[in-house]
Every structure is written in C-alpha cells, then in structure tokens.
Amino acid sequence: ASVLLDGDWRSGALNIGCNPTFLADRRPTRFETYILDFEGSLYGKDILVFIESHIRQEVTFHSAADLVRRMGIDSEEARSRFIEVHAVDRDLYRRLAAAFF
C-alpha cells in the first residue's frame, strides 16, 4: 500500500480481513495499515491509503510470534513493491499528493 501522510508518500502494509489469529469468531472485516518506518502519533492526522497489490491471503497463525515473523516478510515485500511503483509512476503520485493535500 502507498500511504499519503502530511503530503509525503510512505510505504505501508495493509490487511483487509477479520484477524483470525486473535478473533476466532470472525468478526466483521477490518482494514488495518501498518506504516513502515513511521514513529509518532496519527491522532488528528488525515491519511490516504492506496491499495497497490495483493501479497497473500489471510491465514490463521499458530502463535503471535508466527504472525509477527510473517508480518516482517510481508512488510519487506510491501516496501519493495512501494519502491517499484513509485519509481515507475513518480509523476502520478506527485499529482495525487497535490490533489489531496
């Protein structure tokens, strides 16, 4: 995912699902975005999340540690895809940022 925050593009890993590892009763679908290399508060901030590509299906992990390990792999894949699409379509992302902020 590409995340527009304060006029700057950041790479993100987006999960669309029901968190089956922790919520076995399959609650409603949630959209959660992990913004890579971001520290700070998002309270009061406007952000836009652009879905770029699909990495994998949602699965139930045996433990939180297994999930965290896989999130690391997925985050690196998301970072690589972010770098690739922004290198190819730099002008498109510049225009999108200008249109929204």
Question: What is each of the regions a protein language model found here?
Answer:
Residues S2-F101:
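Phosphate/ribose-recognition catalytic cores of enzymes acting on nucleotide-derived substrates
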